[in-house]
């Protein structure tokens, strides 16, 4: 359940949107996360960290994150936002102004983790990049999510899940033979990259603990690319091509090389999904079918 209350930061009234936590201890309690992302990838990572007890402070532009107004709206707020915005404290700041950036820099000094999904180079221009912030907070974990990573020939291009899913090859194998590549009706590229960011953050926190124990600074940069996150889902597609020269083709609702696993139409015009993905399972399936 979402509730709204007023809190204060640096003498200014701000709005906090968060879900009610139960009394059970959570593994990320006492961890402060500053979220600079908008829309999906960065906010999904922040949401996941919040699930497990982290204090997530989301920095929104004036007017709020665009997701607040997308799709179905109830009581003035998008229902989609209620999914991505829960477990967060939300502050509206204009990062294009010096005052807004100064306020963020103050917050960063108290943070354990930063999550951002701006186009590479933007935060460097604003002085909110890892080098600048880790100078004042050497143990800061800085997670960056972008279309194509922070380096390389495509790094400065704006990256959207729609394009990155295609570049990875996912949409090709997800389609139907002889037809255009298919996009699933969910933003998988964004959520998968958000999950990769969370995994990177947790590993970076582990490395930081070890470094601090040894008397060293534990700051880390986690660089997540949307297309690489999707590439990581392709299972045997790449080694099959490298080792056998086989290009995996689109197969519609089936999975190449595994039978029976498909969606089958029933006599009542409804559908059933059957996955007999193993010899013993197949034997039991055939016995059930008769």
Protein language model features and the residues they cover:
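N-terminal helix-loop segment corresponding to the beta1-alpha1 unit
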Residues: 11, 20-214
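Acidic, glycine-rich segments within the central catalytic cores of soluble metabolic enzymes
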Residues: 167, 171-290
